[in-house]
């Protein structure tokens, strides 16, 4: 996903690209925005920008290593970049269950981030719907978010900032995504 494919939020796009261009990439960020504000697409574009070669404020040359996503996730994002949690549950076939990010997932995150990056560059961990982390998961990730390995970036994406535990929030740079302007939405 490219920044040019994201509707509106120009000030946030500029902030994110300037931080990378100036070598000031925060190790932990929390993108907070209601459904439809573009927080998830922005996080994906930002991750690509951090991981890939950039020209003119975009990831134009790509990086095959950054395309190692789960097949179902990639399919959903390609078809519906502004998807919501219900769409993801539907894609997984768990329409009637309540999603939660548990300690097992936290263990997998810790394990994957202890590995060196493929080409010695950044490692970016996106955690979508971060408010779904249970307390055990949040506590397991806390130390890693506080003191991540070199060139490791966490981007947590949430709709409800108040449901994120305060110790996690205090370690993140928080970016709020306002509702899209009517002029951005018009065809």
Segments and roles (model prediction):
Residues 136, 140-145, 160-171:
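Short regulatory helix/loop adjacent to the ATP-binding pocket of P-loop NTPases
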Residues 25-27, 120-122, 148-152, 162, ...:
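Short glycine-/polar-rich loops that comprise or flank the Walker A/P-loop
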């Amino acid at each position: 996903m490219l920044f040019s494919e994201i509707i509106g939020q120009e000030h946030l796009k500029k902030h994110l690209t300037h931080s990378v261009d100036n070598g000031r990439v925060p190790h932990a960020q929390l993108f907070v925005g209601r459904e439809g504000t573009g927080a998830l697409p922005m996080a994906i574009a930002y991750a690509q920008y951090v991981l890939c070669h950039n020209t003119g404020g975009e990831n134009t040359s790509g990086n095959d290593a950054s395309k190692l996503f789960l097949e179902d996730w990639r399919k959903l994002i390609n078809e519906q970049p502004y998807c919501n949690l219900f769409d993801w549950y539907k894609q997984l076939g768990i329409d009637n269950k309540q999603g939660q990010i548990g300690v097992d997932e936290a263990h997998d995150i810790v394990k994957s981030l202890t590995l060196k990056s493929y080409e010695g560059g950044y490692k970016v961990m996106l955690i979508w719907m971060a408010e779904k982390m249970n307390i055990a998961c949040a506590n397991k990730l806390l130390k890693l978010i506080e003191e991540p390995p070199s060139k490791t970036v966490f981007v947590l994406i949430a709709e409800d900032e108040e449901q994120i535990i305060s110790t996690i929030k205090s370690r993140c740079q928080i970016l709020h995504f306002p509702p899209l302007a009517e002029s951005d939405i018009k065809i």
